[in-house]
Design a protein with these regions (language model features):
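Short, structured segments at the rim of ligand-binding sites
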Residues: 1-379
Length: 379
């Protein structure tokens, strides 16, 4: 199987493209709803967008942008709408964006974003569910994030790349798409160093220019394919991946009894379907990703023995457990820990996917279930 371009990178890079006054070409984009919503968002702002979903190529001309506000109907469909605050603020000095939507997996406060904007010199207010950020001139500063927020790190990088002087971000997120967004901005002429480390340093530039850029593969999609093979048994080569980005996922699959071989841009996973119990705790990158937690739980649900899954990122990410229980799983949730007693077999059932990653996990459960999994609704 071949893995698509990264979902999380795509939405950030597309929003960052409006920082350039000349056309940008973005390649390896996945044909997913969030990208389609991003296209609608750019066109709402006045940008010209040519999007070829089959080729995964998008050209964005933001020289025609004529407004800095976004409507609620777009923002409620995509969590990443918050990235337009940083991009619009840097380019136009104003952004009016409703509080973002996205999957209901728990609190994802935007306070770290606002803190960063304010420290750069913006005035930020929230009225009737809409964020209004204004700045005549953004000025570089020293920002310490209270938690390594992916969204805040990306938003602050975008806002700071054209600020006057130098900005330092301490305790930033280190996920692969942080590095990819920084590389995209640098390809447009930004001066960002240290993405993926404990400290990011940004020297503001006057303006950014056009670029052609290909985004990294989606490590969560790759991991989901790997878990599907582990659960069903088989021998599959997963192509168009960066194995280093999958190290935590690979380690847990090996613990569970699978064999994984790594190549330059592919991984091979071999599973006989006989799985072992293990313990997993979600952590910021390079730890085990929270976006792989539901898929891991499905796998452990048919492993021998008792396993535990501890969710340390989001407090509402076990909503899928009731659905998996309908399929015969034996899972007890205590606070942020799921205690999983492996069963021999899942059985088909009518299930509801509470969020995107849970939906993928329930598909995997359906693949190994006895009988038909009738319907998976929502995302």
């Amino acid at each position: 199987v071949r893995v698509s371009g990264g979902k999380n990178t795509s939405v950030a890079v597309i929003s960052a493209s409006i920082l350039s006054e000349t056309p940008c070409v973005i390649e390896n984009l996945p044909n997913i709803e969030d990208v389609n919503v991003s296209v609608e968002t750019l066109r709402h702002l006045g940008a010209k967008v040519n999007w070829d979903p089959d080729a995964g190529v998008m050209e964005v001309d933001s020289s025609t942008i004529s407004r800095t506000d976004l409507p609620l109907e777009l923002c409620r469909r995509m969590r990443a709408s918050s990235y337009y605050i940083g991009a619009l603020l840097a380019r136009f000095g104003r952004a009016q964006v409703p509080l973002p939507g996205g999957c209901d997996i728990g609190r994802r406060p935007i306070d770290q974003h606002i803190k960063g904007f304010e420290q750069l010199g913006a005035k930020v207010s929230i009225h009737h569910g809409k964020i209004d950020a204004q700045a005549e001139n953004l000025v570089g500063t020293h920002i310490y994030l209270d938690c390594p927020s992916v969204g805040a790190t990306i938003n602050i990088m975008m806002a700071a790349c054209m600020a006057e002087g130098k900005t330092i971000i301490e305790n930033p997120a280190k996920e692969p798409h942080i590095v990819d967004v920084a590389n995209f901005l640098n390809s447009m002429g930004a001066n960002i160093r240290g993405a993926g480390t404990d400290v990011i340093r940004i020297v503001g530039v006057e303006k950014l220019h056009k670029t052609e850029y290909s985004i990294i593969p989606d490590q969560i999609e790759a991991g989901t394919f790997m878990f599907a093979v582990a659960a069903t048994g088989g021998d599959v080569l997963v192509k168009n991946v960066i194995p280093k980005h999958l190290e935590a996922t690979t380690a847990k699959l090996v613990e569970a009894g699978c064999k994984v071989e790594e190549f330059d841009d592919a991984v091979r996973i071999i599973s006989n379907g006989k799985l072992h119990h293990t313990q997993v705790t979600t952590l910021p990158y390079p730890g085990f990703p929270t976006d792989m937690q539901p898929q891991m739980a499905v796998l452990l649900g048919i492993a021998e023995g008792t396993s535990t899954v501890t969710e340390s990122i989001f407090e509402n990410r076990f909503k899928y457990v009731d659905e998996l229980t309908r399929m015969g799983a034996n899972i007890k949730v205590e606070s942020n820990i799921a205690i999983i007693n492996g069963v021999n077999q899942y059985t088909g059932a009518h299930v509801n996917a509470p969020d995107l990653r849970a939906g993928a996990a329930l598909v995997i459960a359906g693949l190994v279930a006895d009988g038909i999994t009738l319907k998976i609704i929502n995302k």
